[in-house]
C-alpha cells in the first residue's frame, strides 16, 4: 500500500471528516500489516502540506512525518529521477507525480493511493486508487 502525500495529509483534515476517517483507516491498516510505503519526496511534501495547508504546528508535523518514516521509504536517487522524468514525458504527468508512481513501482506496490491521479489507471502491476471515491467517502 503506497501512499501519496495527498492522501496522508487528509489524516489531519477535520474540515472533511469522511476523508479524514478513510485516510486514517487505510494508514492504520497498512501500518498494522507492515505494508505501508511512501517515497522520501512524499514525506517532504507531506510536511509542507501539513504546515502550509492544514496549519499543523511544525513540531507536530515533524512528529507525524517521522511516524511515516518508519514505513518502507523509497529514496529519490538519480535512477528514480530519470525514470520519473521518462514517465512524466510519456504521460504528461507532473514530475512529482511521476516520481511517486515510479517509487511505488520500484517498491513493488500493487496499489498507489492518491486523490488527484486517474482512478483505476494501471502501470504494470500497480493500480492507482482514489480512496475517497464511492461509498467510503465521496469527493
What residue spans do the PLM features occupy?
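Acidic active-site catalytic centers that drive phospho-/nucleotidyl reactions
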Residues: 4, 45, 97, 115-116
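Acidic, PIN/NYN-like endoribonuclease modules and their adjacent C-terminal/linker elements
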Residues: 101-139
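Conserved beta-strand termini and adjacent loop/short-helix elements that scaffold enzyme active sites
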Residues: 39-41, 76, 131
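Active-site neighborhoods of divalent-metal-dependent phosphate/nucleic-acid chemistry enzymes
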Residues: 71-113
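Short, well-structured N-terminal submotif of metal-dependent ribonuclease cores
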Residues: 1-38, 53-59, 135-139
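Active-site-proximal, substrate-binding regions of enzyme catalytic domains
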Residues: 45-72
